[in-house]
Design a protein with these regions (language model features):
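Long, charge-rich boundary regions
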Residues: 103-168
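Short functional micro-motifs and their immediate structural scaffolds
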Residues: 81
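Generic structural signal for hydrophobic core residues of well-folded globular domains
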Residues: 20, 36-40, 53, 150, ...
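Extended non-catalytic scaffold regions that mediate assembly and binding
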Residues: 46, 51, 57-64, 69, ...
């Protein structure tokens, strides 16, 4: 097994273990997980698979030393006490949710720091004396920062499949943009459309269903 493990790899092993119950009804679930891990991924057992997958997750951790230190995952943006089992488990669940969406869609919503950087850059460009197109690009950066926060929220709620695409989200936000950048809103509406009434004025999160 040369490539880094994915969320889909682990799920495939779990699914095969369930199917193996028909061929090996005498084996407990743990033994069937071992068989599935060896058959699909060539590892010795499920414990080794789980250990390697945890290493894939942990590579993104920023873990300062010292008492009461808070670890921060630079991938899923989760902050937790790294020495607490419950926090470790909660981080893994959160990380796997983001990882699953990333693998399926090819898109990972930005972390808080990434979103704030996009918005800061966006406001600078949108308010600059540059060309209209450059200013529109700035507005789109702001919208991307808002979109990522909204999308992350939908992932946490298990509703990411229902969340609008970025293009649709822009159309939902045009009525709000009209109050912030009235000179840019018509161009955004022409490009993406204008859909009022879905996201409340002054809000930036798509309403969960």
């Amino acid at each position: 097994m040369q490539q880094a493990l994915t969320f889909a790899d682990v799920q495939s092993v779990k699914h095969l273990a369930k199917k193996l119950k028909q061929a090996h009804p005498e084996l407990p679930h743990g033994k069937r997980l071992n068989l599935a891990a060896a058959e699909l991924l060539g590892v010795r057992n499920y414990h080794e698979l789980n250990r390697r997958f945890q290493a894939v997750i942990d590579q993104y951790l920023d873990s300062p030393s010292g008492p009461n230190a808070v670890a921060h995952c630079l991938y899923c943006d989760f902050r937790f006490a790294a020495d607490l089992k419950g926090d470790q488990r909660e981080h893994r669940e959160n990380h796997e949710r983001i990882m699953e969406v990333h693998e399926i869609t090819g898109y990972r919503p930005g972390t808080y720091v990434e979103r704030e950087a996009m918005k800061t850059d966006g406001y600078t460009k949108a308010r600059s004396p540059g060309s209209l197109e450059d200013r529109i690009d700035g507005a789109l950066l702001i919208l991307r920062g808002w979109f990522d926060r909204s999308y992350h929220r939908a992932i946490d709620a298990g509703q990411w499949r229902k969340h609008p695409s970025f293009e649709t989200y822009v159309a939902l936000m045009v009525p709000y943009i009209e109050g912030i950048f009235p000179e840019l809103a018509p161009s955004l509406a022409q490009r993406y459309g204008r859909t009022p009434g879905v996201i409340a004025h002054g809000q930036t999160n798509w309403p969960l269903q």
